[in-house]
């Protein structure tokens, strides 16, 4: 493992090409971050963001800037879990800023966040939607390396999400988990579960009733609500794979 002395930066800008394909217009990244060339899946380009390191360490900082051009359709994925190692008396951080232009679509679906014992991680995401922009955002948080007996042994995990629609704040979620100060397995928090999925959807093409029916048929502990034109889905389970499969089965 190595801790990069400078802030790691990744910038990505996409556009709709003359042939109708979704292409990368601009990109820039510094170690250990990289961008894999897009794969076209029907009319959506799937782009993988990767990190060629074993995970985040103390004082590591990632700055991610994504710009989805007008009418382009992009699915962003990652190649591995976001591993947060022991940060000692400090913390690791990540800030993501996403702009989605008019009539563009983004499915943002990174693999789960995995905080190791004694780790601290601060994650902030700001998303700006233009007129008729569509967003499918998901985040999965693990209690730790459960198979190794590390269950809520991290020091702190905070995740702040702000979504703006035509420059008006329409969604704000602020989660701050401190296991030493909180009863994480209280019925009001994780209860008996170790993995949590959070999905936020702003998409006028999605019918809430159809989603509700799919959720009713799920074996997971899952709920759905609406707010300010958005759809919020929360799910709990003891395996990240089942949460990932649940999202896939929604077939959004």
From Swiss-Prot:
Source domain of life is Bacteria
Q: Which GO terms describe its cellular component?
A: cytoplasm
InterPro entries in the cross-refs: UreD (IPR002669)
Is Chaperone a UniProt keyword of this protein? yes
Q: Which UniProt keywords apply?
A: Chaperone, Cytoplasm, Nickel insertion
Pfam families, per this entry? UreD
Question: What subcellular locations does the record give?
Answer: Cytoplasm
Q: Mitochondrion among the record's keywords?
A: no
Query: Where is the chain membrane-spanning?
Result: none
| Alphabetized GO MF terms | nickel cation binding
Oligomer status and interactors: UreH, UreF and UreG form a complex that acts as a GTP-hydrolysis-dependent molecular chaperone, activating the urease apoprotein by helping to assemble the nickel containing metallocenter of UreC. The UreE protein probably delivers the nickel.
Family per similarity comment: Belongs to the UreD family.
Q: What does this protein do?
A: Required for maturation of urease via the functional incorporation of the urease nickel metallocenter.
The name on file for this protein is Urease accessory protein UreH
Q: Which organism is it from?
A: Helicobacter hepaticus (strain ATCC 51449 / 3B1)
User: Mind giving the lineage of the organism this protein is from?
Assistant: Bacteria, Pseudomonadati, Campylobacterota, Epsilonproteobacteria, Campylobacterales
The record's gene field reads ureH
């Amino acid at each position: 493992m190595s801790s990069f002395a400078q802030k790691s930066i990744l910038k990505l800008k996409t556009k709709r090409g003359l042939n109708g394909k979704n292409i990368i217009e601009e990109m820039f990244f510094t170690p250990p971050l990289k961008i894999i060339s897009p794969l076209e899946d029907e009319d959506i380009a799937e782009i993988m963001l990767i990190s060629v390191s074993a995970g985040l360490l103390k004082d590591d900082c990632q700055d991610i800037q994504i710009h989805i051009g007008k009418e382009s359709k992009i699915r962003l994925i990652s190649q591995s879990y976001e591993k947060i190692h022991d940060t000692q008396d400090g913390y690791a951080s990540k800030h993501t800023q996403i702009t989605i232009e008019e009539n563009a679509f983004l499915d943002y679906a990174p693999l789960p966040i995995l905080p190791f014992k004694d780790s601290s991680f601060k994650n902030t995401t700001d998303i700006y939607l233009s007129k008729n922009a569509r967003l499918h955002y998901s985040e999965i948080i693990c209690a730790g390396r459960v198979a190794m007996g590390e269950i809520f042994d991290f020091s702190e995990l905070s995740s702040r999400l702000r979504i703006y629609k035509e420059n008006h704040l329409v969604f704000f979620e602020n989660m701050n988990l401190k296991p030493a100060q909180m009863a994480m397995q209280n019925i009001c928090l994780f209860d008996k579960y170790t993995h949590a999925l959070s999905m936020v959807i702003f998409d006028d093409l999605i019918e809430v009733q159809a989603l509700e029916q799919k959720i009713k048929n799920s074996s997971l502990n899952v709920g759905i609500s609406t707010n300010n034109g958005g759809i919020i889905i929360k799910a709990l389970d003891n395996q990240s794979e089942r949460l990932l499969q649940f999202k896939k089965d929604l077939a959004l």
